[in-house]
Design a protein with these regions (language model features):
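Signature for the C-terminal beta-barrel architecture of outer-membrane proteins
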Residues: 122-123, 149-299
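Residue-level signature of outer-membrane beta-barrel architecture
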Residues: 55-61, 118-121, 169-171, 197-200, ...
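Outer-membrane beta-barrel translocator domains and adjoining extracellular loop/strand segments
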Residues: 38-43, 78-83, 139-145, 189-193, ...
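Outer membrane beta-barrel
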Residues: 56-176, 198, 374
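Residues that define the transmembrane beta-barrel architecture of outer-membrane proteins
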Residues: 45-49, 108-113, 159-163, 188-192, ...
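Outer-membrane beta-barrel "beta-signal"
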Residues: 324-328, 357, 363-364, 368-371, ...
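Transmembrane beta-strands of outer-membrane beta-barrel proteins
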Residues: 24-30, 65-67, 126, 176-179, ...
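Outer-membrane beta-barrel pore domains and translocons
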Residues: 29-35, 70-72, 131-133, 182-184, ...
Length: 396
């Protein structure tokens, strides 16, 4: 941890001549976050400190340099036992001597989240390094995004950077072609992406093809020699499309992707959504999500389904879900909202009241309560407990 802080200071010192010449801007934020959970008869708390430091500037006429470092510390309950959130029949199937392995740790860390250089040439732009790769038009779920998985309770939170070589080629005024290569240990499992963006009438759209490796962990099989769960690595090929625009006064979007798997069953994902703002400023949004990797009968949910979901190896555990959100500006500074997430597959749902308060131009407060409704074993079951989150962010 100390070594990481010293490295961050060294980077800033090395860039200080550019900072002095105002070629590089230094900015960021500090974030304090409290997360609490009531699970069965237990109450847990986790407090997080996060400092994000950003550097960005144009160091030449056609060259932009950008990077950010995140420093994180965790306090309180820093090891969460996943088995406390699962149904008794799943927990009872796990040997007693292995139950201590199903823990998600929160460890202090310093992360080089993004670090890239962008070259702007006349025929194309070239971006090299760890960069944002955000795909899709969906608000909560993105079938065509093979890089990121959003938290349904906090879908707008920033995503990590990904190491890649990316080229963007303008094809006239309304079209762009993008090629991306993200190297792994060999060519076969490295990510190759080709995307074509365009605009037609009131709609933006894109077509995309991706080849990428996918690791599925088998959380029922533990390898004592490597001290880890066994995992299967396979090749994933995806073709997809996405569109967003305006129709009859509504903002609408749709996204689809079909995945051909090397070893597992093929599957597809589909998103369709719409939003609208009334004259009295209330904003409403709905988004439907179908993922055939998920299951339509909650009695078929198994340990791997739950663990892969918690470990962000897959986007959903149930096949069909609906996200609904309404928000109203109570004052110029305060917005109150309500989220409802429903699993059509098993009938469970969650209510999530939200609050966003702008204390000043550079200070904001966000919070929510998470209340689950559903019988044990379902996607949003009461046995998973209820939770709360409060986040204060100060920009500089």
């Amino acid at each position: 941890m100390i070594k990481g802080v010293l490295c961050a200071i060294l980077v800033i010192l090395c860039l200080s001549p550019l900072l002095a010449q105002e070629k590089i801007d230094l900015f960021g934020y500090y974030e304090a976050q409290y997360m609490g959970a009531k699970v069965k008869s237990n109450t847990y708390q986790l407090f997080t400190n996060k400092l994000r430091l950003d550097l960005k500037g144009q160091i030449a006429d056609n060259i932009t340099l950008a990077a950010n470092i995140n420093v994180l510390t965790y306090h309180g309950k820093t090891n969460w036992d996943v088995l406390e959130f699962l149904s008794d029949d799943i927990v009872s199937s796990i040997p007693e001597e292995l139950r201590s392995l199903y823990v998600i740790p929160f460890e202090n860390d310093i992360v080089l989240d993004n670090a890239y250089v962008r070259f702007r040439f006349k025929p194309f732009d070239l971006t090299v390094g760890k960069q944002q790769v955000s795909l899709g038009t969906g608000y909560v779920w993105n079938p065509t995004d093979v890089f990121n998985i959003k938290d349904p309770l906090d879908p707008t939170y920033e995503q990590p950077g990904h190491n890649a070589l990316r080229g963007d080629v303008p094809l006239g005024s309304f079209h762009t072609a993008t090629v991306l290569y993200s190297p792994e240990d060999n060519w076969r499992y490295s990510t190759k992406l080709l995307q074509f963006k365009g605009r037609m009438a009131h709609f933006d759209y894109y077509l995309i093809g991706v080849v990428r490796d996918w690791v599925f962990t088998d959380f029922t099989r533990f390898d004592a020699e490597s001290m880890s769960f066994e995992a299967t690595r396979e090749r994933r090929q995806m073709l997809g499309a996405s569109t967003a625009g305006e129709l009859l006064g509504l903002g609408v979007w749709a996204e689809y992707a079909y995945n051909w798997m090397e070893l597992s069953d093929d599957f597809y994902e589909l998103v369709a959504g719409a939003d609208y703002t009334f004259d009295f400023q209330t904003f409403v949004m709905v988004e439907y999500y179908r993922n055939t990797l998920g299951k339509s009968d909650y009695r078929e949910y198994d340990l791997n389904d739950w663990m892969r979901y918690y470990a962000a190896e897959q986007k959903a555990i149930s096949r069909d879900q609906l996200y609904a959100f309404a928000q109203h500006p109570v004052t110029d500074l305060l917005n109150l909202g309500l989220i409802n997430i429903t699993s059509f597959s098993d009938g469970s749902f969650a209510f999530v009241p939200t609050l966003f308060y702008s204390l000043s131009d550079n200070v904001e407060i966000y919070g929510y309560l998470n209340i689950n409704f559903g019988k044990e074993g379902k996607a949003y079951s009461k046995s998973q407990g209820n939770g709360a989150l409060i986040r204060v962010r100060v920009y500089f």
